[in-house]
């Protein structure tokens, strides 16, 4: 059997309605996951989830749209759809998203964290951050799952993440 066949067979035995843990799509995704787990310290490592990856991708699309966000249209509608059914996912803010007020009631989404090749360095930079309530969420032992999306914005590579306490139930 090939390595992929062994993985497929082992995942097939997982059963239940929950989605199987995702494998990092790129080496950069793997580095971000490693950095987040370094930031968490002694807490159990986060598991990458493909459904939450979709939610993180939708958050990145909001940043990439580069449009002012007002109260009229829910820019986060697709991200909200992607987290439906995840345990308490709606209670957590996307990590790596900065909302800057451009005028009263109007905001512009911007990326917050640069993706780097060194996971240890990224983890140390996260530990040095202060005043980011979204990042502080990772200190909760209740948070178990994460979705990550790495993207290009301007001349740099950034990442965003979405977390939940548990997977979708059947």
Regions inferred by a protein language model and the residue ranges of each:
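Short, well-ordered surface patches within globular domains
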Residues: 23-91
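A well-ordered secondary-structure block
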Residues: 77-169
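C-terminal motif of bacterial Sec signal peptides marking the signal peptidase cleavage site
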Residues: 10-13
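Second-shell loop/turn segments in exported
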Residues: 19-26, 41-49, 65-67, 99, ...
């Amino acid at each position: 059997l090939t390595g992929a066949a062994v993985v497929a067979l082992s995942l097939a035995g997982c059963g239940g309605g929950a989605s199987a843990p995702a494998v990092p799509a790129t080496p950069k995704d793997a580095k971000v996951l490693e950095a987040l787990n370094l930031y968490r310290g002694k807490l159990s490592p986060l598991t990458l989830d493909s459904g939450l990856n979709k939610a993180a991708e939708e958050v990145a699309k909001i940043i990439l749209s580069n449009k002012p966000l007002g109260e009229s249209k829910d820019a986060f509608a697709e991200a909200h759809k992607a987290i439906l059914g995840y345990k308490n996912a709606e209670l957590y803010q996307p990590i790596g998203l900065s909302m800057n007020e451009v005028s009263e009631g109007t905001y512009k989404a911007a990326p917050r964290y640069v993706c780097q090749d060194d996971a240890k360095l990224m983890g140390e930079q996260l530990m040095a951050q202060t005043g980011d309530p979204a990042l502080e969420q990772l200190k909760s032992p209740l948070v178990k799952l994460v979705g990550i999306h790495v993207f290009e914005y301007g001349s740099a590579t950034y990442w965003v993440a979405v977390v939940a306490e548990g997977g979708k139930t059947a």
